[in-house]
């Protein structure tokens, strides 16, 4: 099966590679942890936001048959997530109130990410286009991150970082899987 994208035929294998690359690219948003340079942070957050939206757009055709309502919810929330990342990146250019809104945006972003990631892994589990154990790992990581995010509302920010490790490891592994192995072609 071949998809037509902008008038050009694109194989499922190429889409899997691009999705894997976009997953890795979305983690460029973490650049803010290493620098305060506006020349690095702003473009990295904008690129990460666009990558998040790109993942959803590319995955939607594969996930739709596993639950149309959930797939629509997934792509909708991913657009919101990507938009928030872009806005937070642009707010980094300002000072005062807009700059101070970055932290609340990322608190909301965390919960939006958890919902979209949970929907993503449930849809991947149902579709079987990747091994189910990767999907289960993703669901467990989402639940763990939800617990960590709720705890962060009451306790130290440092605690949340521990809960991110499980989902980050899962997503980096998934990206590698998609780049190297691609989708289970029997299920697509």
Where are these regions (language model features)?
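Hydrophobic, aromatic-enriched alpha-helical segments typical of multi-pass transmembrane helices
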Residues: 2-188
């Amino acid at each position: 099966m071949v998809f037509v994208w902008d008038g050009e035929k694109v194989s499922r294998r190429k889409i899997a590679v691009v999705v894997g690359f976009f997953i890795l690219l979305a983690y460029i948003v973490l650049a803010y942890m290493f620098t305060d340079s506006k020349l690095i942070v702003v473009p990295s957050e904008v690129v990460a936001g666009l990558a998040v939206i790109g993942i959803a757009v590319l995955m939607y055709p594969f996930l739709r048959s596993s639950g149309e309502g959930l797939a629509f919810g997934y792509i909708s929330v991913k657009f919101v997530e990507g938009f928030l990342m872009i806005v937070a990146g642009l707010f980094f250019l300002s000072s005062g109130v807009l700059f101070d809104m970055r932290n609340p945006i990322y608190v909301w972003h965390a919960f939006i990410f958890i919902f979209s990631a949970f929907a993503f892994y449930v849809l991947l589990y149902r579709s079987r286009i990747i091994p189910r154990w990767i999907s289960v790992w993703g669901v467990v990581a989402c639940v763990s991150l939800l617990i960590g995010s709720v705890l962060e509302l009451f306790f130290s920010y440092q605690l949340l970082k521990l809960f991110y490790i499980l989902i980050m490891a899962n997503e980096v592994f998934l990206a590698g899987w998609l780049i190297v192995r691609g989708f289970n072609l029997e299920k697509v």
